[in-house]
C-alpha cells in the first residue's frame, strides 16, 4: 500500500512540472487521500484531523469532482487565478470534512465562501454582482448564529472538540437555544424555505465549475453539520424540534418542486431540484433510523454525481454552443445531438430516482426512514418522487423530442472532453445503483455508531 501511495505522489509530482498550478492542487488532493485512514494531531493548538466512513464519502466525492470541474471549463477559461480558486475551494472543503473540532469546522465553513465569492464575482454571468452579494449576505449572516453557539460551548466547557462536546449534558432550554443558533446556519446552507432564494440566483450566475462544486459538495456541508454538530450534542432539542424541521422540509419539497415546474431557465430548474433533494436528505438524517441515516448519506453522494452532470449539460455543453439557457430555445436534440440526448435521458431518470440508479436507493431509504418517523409528513414528502418526475420529464421531452428549433443551428455532438465528463459522472451513478454494497460498507461503521448513539441517548423514538 505504501508503494502505491509513493507511485501516486510521484506521478502527480511529475505532472506538476508540466502544469505547475494544477499539479500543486493534485498534490494537495492526493496527499489528503493518502492520510484518509490516519489521524493527524496538532496537540499544541488542540486540533486534530481524521476521517470515518461518513466523512470518507464526502472527502472522496470532493476529490472526484475537483478535477472534473477543472476539465469542464478547460476550453472557456484559462486563467490561472480561476483554477487556483477552484483548487483552494476544493482543499478547504476537504479539510472541512476532516476536522474534528467545532471551531475549525466553522472557520472552514466560512472560508469556503471566499473562493466561491471571488469565482462568481470575477467569472460569473451578467448579474454576477447580485449573485455574489446574495451568497455573502445570506450565508455569512446566518452563520454568525452558529458562531454564537460554538462560542457558548467554549465558554461553558473550554473545548469545542466533537467528542468532548458530545459527553457534556446541557439543560434542555440551553440545548434548544443552541439548536436554533446552529440550525440557522444549516438551514441557509441546505437551503430550506424560506431562506432558499439565494441558491437559484447564485447557480444561474455562477461559472460552471462553481455550480458543480456548489451543488455537488458545498450543499452537503449542511448534512454533515447535522451529523457532527447537532445529533451527538443536542439530543433533547433534536427530539423537540424534529417535527418542526420535518414540516419545513415537507413544505420545501412541495413548494420548490411546484416552482420548478414553472421555470424556463434550465440552470434554475436544476438548482431548484437540488433544494428538493437536499430536503429529503435532511428528513433521512433526522429520522432516528439506520435506514434513514444510510439513505441520507447515499442520496447526498448520488446528488453529488447527478446534479453536477446536469449543470454540465445545461450550463456547459448547450450554453457553450448556443448561449441560451431558456428551455424554449431547445428541441429535437435526439435528431442532431443523439449522444447528448442519451446522456440527458440517463441523468434525468437518475434525478427522478429510477430503479437501478444510486438515487433510487438513497431516496427509498431516506423516505422509508422519514415515514417511520412521521407517517403523514413522510408521505407528503414522498410526493417529491412524482413531482421530480413531472419536471424532469418535461425538460427531457422538450429538449429531446420534436424537431430542431430555428434558434439552434446544426452543430457537433459531444466532444471527447464532454463525453469524458458525462461518462465519469454517469458510471458511478449506475454502478452504485446496481452494486450499492461499496457505499454501504464504507458508511456502515459511522452510520451504525450514529444510530446506536441515537437509540441510547434519545428518549423519544418512533412516530411524531
From Swiss-Prot:
NCBIfam families: NDH_I_M. The lineage of its organism: Eukaryota, Fungi, Dikarya, Ascomycota, Saccharomycotina. The gene is NAD4. This is NADH-ubiquinone oxidoreductase chain 4. Core subunit of the mitochondrial membrane respiratory chain NADH dehydrogenase (Complex I) that is believed to belong to the minimal assembly required for catalysis. Complex I functions in the transfer of electrons from NADH to the respiratory chain. The immediate electron acceptor for the enzyme is believed to be ubiquinone. Keywords: Electron transport, Membrane, Mitochondrion, NAD, Respiratory chain, Translocase, Transmembrane, Transmembrane helix, Transport, Ubiquinone. The chain crosses the membrane at residues 18-38, 54-74, 79-99, 102-122, 131-151, 168-188, 207-227, 239-259, 266-286, 297-317, 332-352, 375-395, 420-440. It is a multi-pass membrane protein. InterPro entries: NADH_Q_OxRdtase_chainM/4, NADH_UbQ_OxRdtase, ND/Mrp_TM. Its EC number is 7.1.1.2. GO terms for biological process: aerobic respiration; electron transport coupled proton transport; mitochondrial electron transport, NADH to ubiquinone. It is found in: Mitochondrion membrane. It is an enzyme of class 7 (translocase). Its main location: mitochondrion. It comes from the Eukaryota. One of its GO terms (cellular component) is mitochondrial membrane. GO terms for molecular function: NADH dehydrogenase (ubiquinone) activity; ubiquinone binding. It catalyses: a ubiquinone + NADH + 5 H(+)(in) = a ubiquinol + NAD(+) + 4 H(+)(out). Belongs to the complex I subunit 4 family. It comes from Candida albicans (strain SC5314 / ATCC MYA-2876). The keyword Hydrolase does not apply.
